[in-house]
Amino acid sequence: MLVAVGLNQKGATVADREVLALPAEGFQSTLAEYAALDAVDEIAVMSTCYRVEIYAATRCPAAATLSLRQALNARAGRELPLFELHGEEAYRHLVRVASSLESAILGEPQILGQVKEAFQRSIDQGVAAKELTSVLNRALSAAKRVRTDTAIGRAGISWGHAAATLAEKVLGKMQGRRVVVVGAGEMARLSAQHLRDQGARIVVLNRTLVNGEALAREVGGVARPLEALGEELAQADVVVSAAPVAPDAFQPEAMAELSRSRKRPIVLVDLAVPRAIPAATGAIRDVYLCDVDDLDRVMKAAMSERAAAVADADRIIAEEVGKFVRAEAERRAAPLIQEMRTRASAIAREEVERTLRRLGEDPEVERRLEAMAGSIVSKILHAPSARLRQAVCDGCSGEALVSAAVEIFELSADIRVHRGNAA
């Protein structure tokens, strides 16, 4: 059975997470220690800035999660707010993580690779094998379906996302566009980061050049003094104004003259309140002005898209979890059902042979009797097999039925049913 134990940004502080974080130099030895814990058959550890989560395959969930909890608390030297999940809930959580539904930023693309890397490390080290490999492949397939079939990857809601969305409506893709960001504060930084991520070339203008240079380094752009605004307006495709500027910097008369000489569109994004750019400037030909109200409308639309994307993702994940549960039930019930069918088939074969001894050798009769016996075995065991698979899924409520089947059919198969979920 799959179990998960760990903590993440939703229920644990940075201080809690950092004591469990696995540095690269000690990763292999710590992974080996966890793999050697009581009742742990296979193991994978995901360690990022937002989460430290252990996924394990085990035949004894209660013992495995207890040993994992004890090991993690011992590593921290204190009791940690660890979560614990069993079976389908552990798998559901893994798919949500891989789909970025559990990320600090919904839709962020890095998490899928991080999940794959975490499991691959364990596979390479020999502490994860068939069961966790199967879980990983299923989870990655489900997460890719979420990203392909929903708008999760497009559901950003930052100021930068809104600014880029409005600019793209006018100019098309931001790849290679020259974007001038006025200011070096938080609004400027968020806008610069997102536009950089869209492929734009960033120029930061700031009254205090050293602050502008710091932001420029962060986004891979260049910094210039605020006095260069006039020169930059002649070259820019997009200007994001996130700091006070000279009163005449964006005056309609100056912008009209600039527009005539440029002969191409320019998008002005005014993030200031009160506004730094006069509304009349937006009426000039080839000048497209957006203010915070325009950005707010884009962000609300993105939030609505995100809510719809999450709902779509949850539906897909529910389907994928259902497939996982059915596959797990089939896998775990298979030894019991196989033994039951083998015993029934052996009895049927004995009766066929006894009948043939009375009737004498006749290949056609033998063929018909064997076909009839096989059909009877399949039909008699169809319902019991289906109920046993369901009993394995039902956990404790189905344990009595599994035990009864073992007793009634005199089976020796060792099968442990699901012992329930823990959140």
Curated annotation (Swiss-Prot):
<dbReference type="InterPro" id="IPR036343">
    <property type="entry name" value="GluRdtase_N_sf"/>
</dbReference>
<comment type="similarity">
    <text>Belongs to the glutamyl-tRNA reductase family.</text>
</comment>
<dbReference type="Pfam" id="PF05201">
    <property type="entry name" value="GlutR_N"/>
</dbReference>
<feature type="binding site">
    <location>
        <position position="103"/>
    </location>
    <ligand>
        <name>substrate</name>
    </ligand>
</feature>
<dbReference type="GO" id="GO:0008883">
    <property type="term" value="F:glutamyl-tRNA reductase activity"/>
</dbReference>
<keyword id="KW-0627">Porphyrin biosynthesis</keyword>
<feature type="binding site">
    <location>
        <begin position="108"/>
        <end position="110"/>
    </location>
    <ligand>
        <name>substrate</name>
    </ligand>
</feature>
<dbReference type="InterPro" id="IPR036291">
    <property type="entry name" value="NAD(P)-bd_dom_sf"/>
</dbReference>
<dbReference type="GO" id="GO:0050661">
    <property type="term" value="F:NADP binding"/>
</dbReference>
<feature type="active site" description="Nucleophile">
    <location>
        <position position="49"/>
    </location>
</feature>
<feature type="binding site">
    <location>
        <position position="114"/>
    </location>
    <ligand>
        <name>substrate</name>
    </ligand>
</feature>
<protein>
    <recommendedName>
        <fullName>Glutamyl-tRNA reductase 2</fullName>
        <ecNumber>1.2.1.70</ecNumber>
    </recommendedName>
</protein>
<feature type="site" description="Important for activity">
    <location>
        <position position="93"/>
    </location>
</feature>
<dbReference type="Pfam" id="PF00745">
    <property type="entry name" value="GlutR_dimer"/>
</dbReference>
<comment type="pathway">
    <text>Porphyrin-containing compound metabolism; protoporphyrin-IX biosynthesis; 5-aminolevulinate from L-glutamyl-tRNA(Glu): step 1/2.</text>
</comment>
<dbReference type="InterPro" id="IPR036453">
    <property type="entry name" value="GluRdtase_dimer_dom_sf"/>
</dbReference>
<feature type="binding site">
    <location>
        <begin position="48"/>
        <end position="51"/>
    </location>
    <ligand>
        <name>substrate</name>
    </ligand>
</feature>
<keyword id="KW-0560">Oxidoreductase</keyword>
<comment type="subunit">
    <text>Homodimer.</text>
</comment>
<dbReference type="Pfam" id="PF01488">
    <property type="entry name" value="Shikimate_DH"/>
</dbReference>
<dbReference type="InterPro" id="IPR000343">
    <property type="entry name" value="4pyrrol_synth_GluRdtase"/>
</dbReference>
<dbReference type="InterPro" id="IPR015895">
    <property type="entry name" value="4pyrrol_synth_GluRdtase_N"/>
</dbReference>
<feature type="binding site">
    <location>
        <begin position="183"/>
        <end position="188"/>
    </location>
    <ligand>
        <name>NADP(+)</name>
    </ligand>
</feature>
<keyword id="KW-0521">NADP</keyword>
<dbReference type="InterPro" id="IPR018214">
    <property type="entry name" value="GluRdtase_CS"/>
</dbReference>
<dbReference type="InterPro" id="IPR006151">
    <property type="entry name" value="Shikm_DH/Glu-tRNA_Rdtase"/>
</dbReference>
<dbReference type="InterPro" id="IPR015896">
    <property type="entry name" value="4pyrrol_synth_GluRdtase_dimer"/>
</dbReference>
<comment type="function">
    <text>Catalyzes the NADPH-dependent reduction of glutamyl-tRNA(Glu) to glutamate 1-semialdehyde (GSA).</text>
</comment>
<dbReference type="GO" id="GO:0019353">
    <property type="term" value="P:protoporphyrinogen IX biosynthetic process from glutamate"/>
</dbReference>
